[in-house]
């Protein structure tokens, strides 16, 4: 189990599925509030070294966020006692003033006083909701980063350099493998082909083999696609190799 303090009023406890099983708990136990669940919460609180400001707090509220391999438990402290009495409502008007209030006015005054007493609880709940939202955003960003990394590994860009358009057209005639995207640029009196290949499903050494095959008829270049896009002149878009294959080499 891991514990992380998110704010003065909220901590997050991460419990792995193995820890749940050791304690005789299942995911389904958290779907419906029950005495077994509450006992489990307070048991893990006893096991963990709680922050000092949580030890003497009043009520504790728990919110569970199930994950595929773990459970996140958000614990929010409250300073509002379970049994709110009129002695706690010291800011209520005196009895003489209360006697002149209509029932509606009295209820509004009582509601206002209770709201003031429970304001910290409301702020704690808002803090908890903010923490959950930030965690969801972080997880979403991590998933996006992972997807981006996977895409980067799946696709490979090759940049090839040719002295003239005739050499580029001659190279295009040799292409007998699948290309997902290709562009032809002119930059500094030379011609450049950018070739995007999807290598998913191919052997690990396929990208190196493909580069060696390309270098039989072209020179690979250190110039990046970004440089070509910014400083080069785009001649053929998207399917440049196919376009060059239609050029008759004299």
Curated annotation (Swiss-Prot):
Gene3D superfamilies with a match to the protein in the record: 3.30.70.1950
**Which GO molecular function annotation, any one, does this entry have?**
protein-macromolecule adaptor activity
Which residues pair up as cystines?
Answer: none
What does the record list as coiled-coil region(s)? none
Recorded superkingdom: Bacteria
Pfam entry (one): MecA
Membership in a protein family: Belongs to the MecA family.
NCBIfam families reported in the protein's UniProt record: PRK02315.1-4
Q: What is known of its domains?
A: The N-terminal domain probably binds unfolded/aggregated proteins; the C-terminal domain interacts with ClpC.
**Whom does it interact with, and what assembly results?**
Homodimer.
**Role this protein plays:** Enables the recognition and targeting of unfolded and aggregated proteins to the ClpC protease or to other proteins involved in proteolysis.
Q: Under which name does UniProt file this protein? A: Adapter protein MecA
Query: Which organism does this record belong to?
Result: Streptococcus sanguinis (strain SK36)
